[in-house]
Amino acid sequence: MLMPKRTKHRKMFRGRMKGAAHKGNFVAFGDYGLQALEPSWITNRQIESCRVAINRTFKREGKTYIRIFPDKPITARPAGVRMGKGKGNVEGWVSVVRPGRILFEVSGVTEEKAAAALRKAAMKLPIRCKVVKREEKENGGEN
């Protein structure tokens, strides 16, 4: 499972997901990518499930790039505990994903195989996603 080795603070505010992704919204490493269309928290278990689904489709060919990392701790109180008495213990880790963010990238496989693998990965996520292709930029921008 993905999680930070160490953090500056143990617990974090929930925050809010406003607007679209400002960074990480272009295919940078691979040839095809999976782009988020909705805002959500993606857990480390969901990321791992997508990684396994993609790699099983490829059968040891091609390369997978994970473009998100779960760096936000999520706390929860035990069941049957009354309100108050402080913030709960860290239960898991999530990555905050905004619309437009590239979640996974793949390279070294055909377009059909890449699209099939990324669609399988999208089924494991709680948000709508679309498969995007790398586009070359003339102006020297990102990729």
Curated annotation (Swiss-Prot):
Molecular function GO labels: rRNA binding; structural constituent of ribosome; tRNA binding
SUPFAM superfamilies, per the entry: Ribosomal protein L16p/L10e
Gene Ontology cellular-component annotations: cytosolic large ribosomal subunit
Record keyword rRNA-binding present: yes
Tagged with keyword Secreted: no
Pfam families named in the record: Ribosomal_L16
This protein's UniProt keywords: Ribonucleoprotein, Ribosomal protein, RNA-binding, rRNA-binding, tRNA-binding
Record Gene3D superfamilies: Ribosomal protein L10e/L16
InterPro entries xrefs: Ribosomal_uL16, Ribosomal_uL16_bact-type, Ribosomal_uL16_CS, Ribosomal_uL16_dom, Ribosomal_uL16_sf
Gene Ontology BP terms: translation
Membrane-crossing residue ranges in chain numbering: none
Subunit structure: Part of the 50S ribosomal subunit.
Function: Binds 23S rRNA and is also seen to make contacts with the A and possibly P site tRNAs.
HAMAP family, sorted: Ribosomal_uL16
Family membership noted in the UniProt record: Belongs to the universal ribosomal protein uL16 family.
Protein name: Large ribosomal subunit protein uL16
Lineage of producing organism: Bacteria, Fusobacteriati, Fusobacteriota, Fusobacteriia, Fusobacteriales
GN (gene name): rplP
